[in-house]
Regions:
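Short hydrophobic beta-strand element within catalytic cores of glycosyltransferases
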Residues: 207-210
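Membrane-proximal helix-turn-helix segments that form the acceptor-binding/catalytic region
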Residues: 25-49
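A conserved mid-protein helix/loop that constitutes part of the nucleotide-sugar donor-binding site
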Residues: 104-127, 149, 235
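Aromatic "clamp/platform" in nucleotide-sugar-dependent glycosyltransferases that forms part
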Residues: 190
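Nucleotide-activated donor-binding/catalytic signature segment of Leloir-type glycosyltransferases, i.e.
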Residues: 149-169
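Conserved acidic donor-binding segment of nucleotide-sugar-dependent glycosyltransferases
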Residues: 222-223, 227-234, 243-248
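Short alpha-helical donor nucleotide-sugar binding micro-motif in glycosyltransferases
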Residues: 169-170, 177-182
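Carbohydrate-associated surface elements
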Residues: 55, 76
Length: 271
């Protein structure tokens, strides 16, 4: 009866699949309250939970729920929605990517916010350009105006105005061309319940470099179908990107492995 009395708590965990992260201070405080009120009764009644990632499952098991109560189901993608559309056309960003003839093309897609740390992206780009002066960063995303303005100011302060190209949004049916023009996809997130952009980038055969997070934990075998690094050193990220690009055969194997991971394990049909 408890799950029906408090469906929002049960559904919240089943749907969103959170896990512990120091970044989530407000959520961590909320969890302490929920745990005190509900977890003991969930244990006694054997309430079952579905999670999006193994990190989320571990988070619940640490609350002394039994393994039988918690099942990881992952997240799927509708591959048909990402297939070719002859009338898709090109975004302005894709046109700029096509115009770049030399240098790495790095891509970030997502909200511009502290959790995704766009300032770290700029630091990585600056490090990459020490070895590859023509490298550029392409961004699709928006956020709170004040924060976006601070990121734009940092671009100027770091002297990156000529190599960072930014579009606030683009329709899903035009994303294929953007992904496929990129050499590598970056997601330096502090915390990610799953991250659909990881699935999309892998579906379009891009090598992903990201942090340990909910989606990476489920999708990526670092060095095989993508790359996972702690977000501690922009120079290390830059070296990883440059080393990956310098080995086209290995990069191609990783791109194909990324695609096969999604097709065989992470479409809704596969799940």
């Amino acid at each position: 009866r408890l799950a029906s009395d408090f469906p929002h708590q049960a559904a919240h965990r089943a749907k969103d699949g959170p896990y512990y992260s120091p970044f989530n201070k407000n959520y961590n405080r909320m969890c302490r309250v929920f745990d005190a009120l509900f977890v003991g009764r969930y244990r006694r009644r054997g309430t079952r939970f579905l999670t999006k990632s193994e990190l989320a499952r571990k988070f619940l098991l640490e609350k002394r729920l039994s393994p039988e109560q918690v099942t990881t189901v992952g997240v799927g993608i509708d591959a048909e929605l990402l297939r070719d559309r002859p009338d898709a056309g090109q975004t302005e960003l894709e046109q700029k990517m096509r115009a770049q003839k030399t240098g790495l093309k790095l891509l970030y897609i997502g909200r511009i916010e502290p959790r995704r740390d766009p300032f770290f992206l700029l630091d990585v780009l600056a490090e990459v350009r020490k070895s590859d002066p023509d490298a550029c960063l392409y961004i699709i995303g928006d956020g709170d105006a004040e924060y976006v303005d601070s990121v734009k100011a940092a671009i100027g302060e770091k002297g990156l105005e000529s190599c960072v190209f930014w579009q606030k949004k683009a329709p899903q049916y035009q994303m294929k061309g953007v992904y496929q023009q990129a050499d590598l996809f970056l997601l330096p997130t502090e915390y990610e319940i799953f991250g659909m952009v990881l699935l999309e980038a892998m579906f379009f055969r891009r090598v992903v470099l990201t942090t340990p997070n909910g989606g990476a934990d489920m999708l990526l075998r670092s060095g095989e179908n993508g790359l996972v690094l702690e977000k501690s050193d922009p120079a290390r990220w830059a070296k990883t990107l440059l080393d990956t690009a310098a080995d086209p055969e290995k990069k191609a194997r990783m791109e194909q492995a990324a695609y096969e991971t999604v097709i065989h394990e992470n479409t809704w049909d596969a799940l």
